[in-house]
Design a protein with these regions (language model features):
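Amphipathic alpha-helical segments
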Residues: 1-18, 109-121
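Solvent-exposed, well-ordered amphipathic alpha-helical segments
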Residues: 2-3, 7, 38-42, 95-96, ...
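Short, solvent-exposed secondary-structure boundary motifs
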Residues: 3-10, 22-30, 79-80
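Amphipathic, interaction-prone secondary-structure segments
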Residues: 13, 17-43
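Beta-strand/loop substructures that line and gate deep hydrophobic ligand-binding cavities in soluble
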Residues: 34-59
Length: 122
């Protein structure tokens, strides 16, 4: 039950992992969004997060017109949902109590996209 085995599992799925204090941050290669995995003893919280650079990143994609940004965001969220299923199994198998909080992050990201689309289309 080493955290290194968890990191190895995440990396094997194509993600980059950063460790800071009691937290692992799983980065996505397409968008500046990430999963934060926060440890507190035998409890762990997994949440979908992003930083301020996401707004500018989405604005640039929308203005370039080169991608369907909504589809891209949904794909990234879907990939993180799949990874979270693997994380859930790993944590349960290793005796952790897990609290998954992806929905809040999903809603925040989709609201950000809607705001940007309203501004750029209006």
């Amino acid at each position: 039950m080493s955290i290194q085995s968890l990191v190895d599992m995440i990396v094997s799925k194509g993600y980059q992992v950063q460790g800071v204090g009691n937290k692992l941050r799983v980065l996505h290669h397409l968008l500046p969004v990430y999963l934060d995995i926060v440890f507190s003893g035998s409890r762990v919280v997994v949440k979908l997060s992003f930083d301020n650079s996401l707004r500018e990143f989405i604005e640039d994609l929308v203005l370039s017109g080169s991608e369907d940004v909504g589809d891209l965001i949904e794909d990234v969220i879907g990939e993180f949902n799949e990874l979270t299923a693997s994380l859930y199994k790993w944590f349960k198998d290793n005796g952790f109590e897990i609290n998954i909080k992806l929905k809040e992050g999903e809603i925040d990201i989709m609201e950000l996209l809607e705001d940007i689309l309203e501004i750029t289309e209006g």
